[in-house]
Amino acid sequence: MTAKYRELDVWTAGMDLVEHCYQLTTSLPRDEQFGMTSQVRRAAVSIPANIAEGSCRKSDPVFRNHISIALGSHAELETYLEIAKR
């Protein structure tokens, strides 16, 4: 049985984003391994994870809450990437 969240384009895009972020963080300085690298990866992983968790819930309000959390994680990730760019 395949989980329905795997059929969501937004989940697939989130998984692609995680892969990209993992590749990107390998180029960060070693002294950022437990700082920026960890934060970027955690924020990225949170996006598809919350989409998957929310889609498996049986309540639309709970699903919307998880989507809201995923959006927050996306904003967090954007901020970390902007900081890393500077």
Question: Which residue stretches match the model-derived regions?
Answer:
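Amphipathic alpha-helical assembly/interaction segments
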Residues: 1-86
